[in-house]
């Protein structure tokens, strides 16, 4: 019996080892699962002084639309900044799409490898903020006497807080804090083939209404017996093309004072006014008067080819519009000569205009090293200096975000030379910039919250799906709209973000229950350790008994 008992441990050792291996494996899985989430960083605290004895290497992610002039502005800004701060080295990574920047940032948050400074949008920042201390709040940095806006220790002529256009700065406030600085601002403009409007017997108003646009567009669909459009003598004519249908829906709702969302994240877009707008889209897609960029391609190409009368696009795309545009995506022999006019986007009530404010902002990512964050903040501020602001704004129909740069002698000289050439001083580009400066008080932005970027995409999807359905000969009625609302709500998971209350900080604290897989993993791990404990206890009791 004694001999048999001595062999027993060998018989049970294997299960014990298996159990131990299983426990370690489960623990490893749990560790890896934890690593997949965002890496927490301590809250940023401003250092008392900037340590100039150290070298810093910071990364800057930017967007340039493949515009070499914009790239040159960035490169010159980095060179000038590094001359002032030789211990700070800036590595720039260029993107051609804001969504790719957004996706890469989200991916890198999980691994703690975000850039230091990033060109972005407030909607995107709201998502970044779901991680703990991922973005550095800028309120205290703004006010810091030494290194803040217009601070005494800056080695450049920085802008003070009251020198930033208030409307543009307010767009960078999310919840109770500022998380970005505005970098450039634009809006949307209506680019018009004025020659064709007058050819159809109409006079182009200073502020066209939606009714005017629809009426002229429907009129332009008339064809001759051979199928050529009467207005241009060609086989192709899309009178009205809108590039960004999310902006189209958002601005229509704002002009109608209709609900879109609350600042707390309550989704309100699925309403009767939206339904009315979609039926309007239905009617004019059916006549061939209206299409979108996603369906038909870039509106500027059709406009320049004499195949479009009204093209809505960003003022930041003005250098692609018109017969003499410095940038073209079509062959020279396709371009038609016409007079181009720049107008505000269509309005329901021109006496009370509303147009969206858009354009990139700059955020600073938090890091374990507060000195590194301060170095990043210094570079971010440098992007608001006059030379950078005017240099970049002049590449397109952008507007500098500081009153200081707007009123500078260099920028005023640039505006005064409108039409002097068809490159740097291209008249359409400067007209577009002046449109925004003259309407800054009429601009607005949508509420920002975690999920607001998805809501924006959903707004455009409603128009896109309605237009596609008409082109596919589907019946677009109330039943269709009801189904569309449900599909879009599900596709963009709006039902999962609707009705949130409180600040983003509150939302992070209220994360809800653990996912089922996490619960199962934790339970399995606990069970494994319990079994190991029971086995060891049993073995100990046996040893005691046989002693």
Which functions belong to the PLM regions below?
Residues 1-58, 493-547:
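Short, low-complexity disordered leader/linker segments with a strong preference
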Residues 216-218, 262-296, 340-341, 345:
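Glycine-centered hinge/linker elements that transmit conformational signals in sensory
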Residues 427-547:
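Conserved C-terminal helix/tail region of periplasmic/extracytoplasmic solute-binding proteins
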């Amino acid at each position: 019996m004694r001999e048999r008992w001595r062999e027993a441990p060998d018989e049970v050792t294997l299960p014990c080892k298996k159990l131990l291996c299983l426990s370690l494996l489960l623990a490893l899985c749990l560790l890896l699962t934890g690593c997949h989430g965002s890496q927490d960083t301590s809250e940023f605290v401003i250092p008392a002084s900037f340590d100039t004895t150290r070298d810093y290497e910071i990364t800057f992610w930017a967007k340039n639309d493949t515009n070499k002039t914009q790239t040159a502005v960035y490169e010159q800004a980095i060179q000038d900044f590094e001359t002032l701060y030789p211990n700070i080295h800036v590595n720039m990574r260029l993107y051609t799409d804001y969504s790719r920047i957004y996706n890469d940032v989200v991916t890198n948050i999980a691994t703690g490898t975000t850039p230091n400074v990033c060109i972005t949008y407030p909607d995107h920042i709201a998502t970044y903020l779901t991680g703990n201390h991922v973005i550095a709040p800028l309120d205290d940095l703004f006010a810091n006497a030494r290194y803040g806006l217009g601070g005494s220790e800056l080695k450049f002529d920085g802008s003070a807080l009251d020198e930033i256009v208030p409307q543009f700065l307010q767009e960078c406030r999310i919840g109770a804090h500022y998380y970005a600085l505005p970098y450039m601002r634009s809006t949307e403009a209506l680019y018009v083939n004025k020659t064709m409007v007058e050819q159809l017997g109409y006079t182009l108003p200073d502020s066209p209404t939606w009714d005017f646009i629809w009426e002229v567009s429907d009129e332009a669909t008339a064809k001759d017996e051979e199928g050529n459009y009467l207005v241009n003598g060609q086989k192709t004519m899309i009178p009205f093309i809108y590039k960004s249908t999310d902006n189209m829906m958002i601005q229509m709702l704002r002009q109608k004072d209709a609900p879109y969302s609350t600042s707390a994240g309550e989704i309100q877009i699925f309403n009767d006014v939206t339904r009315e707008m979609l039926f309007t889209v239905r009617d004019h897609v059916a006549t061939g008067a209206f299409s979108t960029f996603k369906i038909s391609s870039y509106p500027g190409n059709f406009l320049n080819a004499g195949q479009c009368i009204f093209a809505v696009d960003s003022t930041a795309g003005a250098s692609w519009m018109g017969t003499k545009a410095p940038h073209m995506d079509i062959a020279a022999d396709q371009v038609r000569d016409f007079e181009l006019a720049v107008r505000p986007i269509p309005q329901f009530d021109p006496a009370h205009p509303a147009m969206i404010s858009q354009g990139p902002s700059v955020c600073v990512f938090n890091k374990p090293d507060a000195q590194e964050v301060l170095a990043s903040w210094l570079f971010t501020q440098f992007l608001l200096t006059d030379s950078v602001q005017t240099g970049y704004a002049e590449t397109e129909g952008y507007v500098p975000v500081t009153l200081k740069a707007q009123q500078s002698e260099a920028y005023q000289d640039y505006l005064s030379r409108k039409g002097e050439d068809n490159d740097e001083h291209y008249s359409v580009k400067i007209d577009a910039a002046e449109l925004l400066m003259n309407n800054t008080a009429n601009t607005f932005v949508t509420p920002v919250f975690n999920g607001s970027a998805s809501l924006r995409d959903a707004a455009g999807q409603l128009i896109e799906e309605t237009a596609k359905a008409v082109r596919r000969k589907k019946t677009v009625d109330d039943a269709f709209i009801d189904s569309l609302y449900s599909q879009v709500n599900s596709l963009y998971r709006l039902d999962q973000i609707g009705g949130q209350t409180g600040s983003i900080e509150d939302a992070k604290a209220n994360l809800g229950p653990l996912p089922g897989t996490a619960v199962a993993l934790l339970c399995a791990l606990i069970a494994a350790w319990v079994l190991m404990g029971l086995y060891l206890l049993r073995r100990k009791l046996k040893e005691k008994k046989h002693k």
